[in-house]
Amino acid sequence: MLSSIEAAEITKLAKEENLNADVFGPLAFDNSISKKSAGIKGIKNLVAGEADVLLVPSVETGNALVKMMIYFMGACAAGVVVGGKVPVVITSRSDEAQARLASIAAAVVALD
């Protein structure tokens, strides 16, 4: 799968750039958030089951994941696109005020 190849490339690039972060992939969602699932599948990595950030292969995948976290888990989501000249705040028309504020705060942090 293309997304698995891209995740492996991101992992390799992160190691080459010597980032101050643990980056590992590809990981299925369960292996990203559950040490038990990762252990059953024999995945041995610091990130497995402990991921703080999840990268997704498309905006549609990310949208579905975030909506599930909001509506099933009570999460507050912040949306910001980085990589351009300035960060771009991304919100949903149905976002609560807390999520809108979190998105603005994330964009401000991304400015540095």
Residue ranges and their predicted role:
Residues 28, 59, 93-95:
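Short, ordered loop/turn segments at secondary-structure junctions
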Residues 22-26, 57, 82, 90:
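General beta-strand structural signal in soluble alpha/beta enzymes
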Residues 32-33, 62-67, 97-99:
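Short active-site-adjacent structural elements
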Residues 68, 75-112:
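C-terminal functional extensions of proteins
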